[in-house]
Amino acid sequence: MYEELIAKMNPCPKFNLQWYKNEDLYSDGEVEDFIIKIIAENRPEDYSNAVYEQFNWPIYYHLSPLRKNILNWYKFKPDSSVLEIGCGMGAITSVLCDECKDVTAVELSRKRATATLLRCREKENLEIIVGNLNDIEFDKKFDYITLIGVLEYQGTYTESTNPYMDFLVKIKQLLKPDGKLLVAIENQYGLKYWCGMPEDHVGIPFEGINQYRDVERGVRTFSKTALDTLIKESGFHNTYFYYPYPDYKLPTVIYSQDVLPSKKDTINSENFRDYSSADKNTLIANEKKLYTDIVENGVFEFFANSFLVECSDSSQLGEITFARLTSERKEQYRMATRFTRDSTVEKKPLTMLCAQTHVRQLFKNVNILKQAGIKIVEYRADNGMVVSDYIEKPLLEDVILNALKEGNTDEIYRLIDLIYEERMGLCPSDMLACICVKTDDMKNDLR
């Protein structure tokens, strides 16, 4: 299978077929061959043009840069090892290779593993094992293990009377002491399902809400409480919940149990994924019109479409409490803005091109504003990132927009006059201290 193409491209990762049983138990069909063709004909992770020229859901899902957003903001320890269970077609594997010292990716489908091999062909720190994790014998333990869209299928791939718990127990044995498991999964009671979206895995509306009446399907998701209980009963002492928005598959914002969306947050069509494209006939409500009430009534955690759970015996969890990702931008502008527990804000470039161009230009813009006499948030460089202290103040943009909504044009003129006077040195620099003035790149990230 693709032996000639592999030989021609001579990828760097190790491709281990020792545990492969010569059958692929799942597939998206012929489109997977087309995806492999796109991967082979383009430089790694440069698929945007090809995706939009031949747009369909499987191609977009497997090759979209938004797939990386589930983990590209996460702080992995330096020199760490990671086991990726269910790497699929490599959507997240390259992120792990860039962030960790050693990566072992396991994939049950040889065709999908081949896609990962070619997609990560330049990664020398990667081994891909084709086979069922339950059959594989490992000779080492890992700092991190990822289960991104995998746990829900263990009713099919783990033979046990309690497959979900037994699978997690096995995984815990592969972690180093204080190692961390990262689990991404849909919420059984996600808001999209209440609106009539067919359940992601079985394709039937309200199937999860109705408690998965057909238990023979071998696939299911969990509520937050049920998932937390399952993880802890499997032996993990601590959990920390993140809420990828709009879901874990194509997230643009990562909320957490410490930083939940507030009334003023932009939970609307700006970052909204159109779930209705699958089958509009099943929808009974418009999801994006419900979020304001969900947030105001304090039940976002129950209705969040997806979870990302950090699991460990260590209590050192939740180092990052919020992240906003801009992977949908052009490559040179892709950034992760993340809030840390120690009240700093880090802007991390997600591509080398962004690090080399946009970050440098950002600092130039900051200096220009300073030289012009405009008081702005202080930024510093740290390991390739742009770092600042978190300041709990409104953005000037928001203050002006609120005045506009209220019809208070006098307030708008007053603020503009203050900026002009500060620019000309005609008023004290602390006159605008109650407002944050940010560069254009910053203003949307820290709302």
Task: Report the location of each language-model feature.
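Conserved ATP-binding subdomain of kinase catalytic cores across diverse folds
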Residues: 316-397, 407-432
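A short glycine-rich, Lys/Arg-flanked "PGG" loop and its adjoining helix->strand segment in the class I
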Residues: 162-180
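Class I SAM-dependent methyltransferase SAM/SAH-binding core
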Residues: 99-127, 132
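Conserved class I S-adenosyl-L-methionine
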Residues: 182-205
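Conserved SAM-binding loop of SAM-dependent methyltransferases across substrates and taxa
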Residues: 89-100
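N-terminal auxiliary segments of SAM/dcSAM-dependent transferases
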Residues: 1-41
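Short alpha-helix
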Residues: 217-241
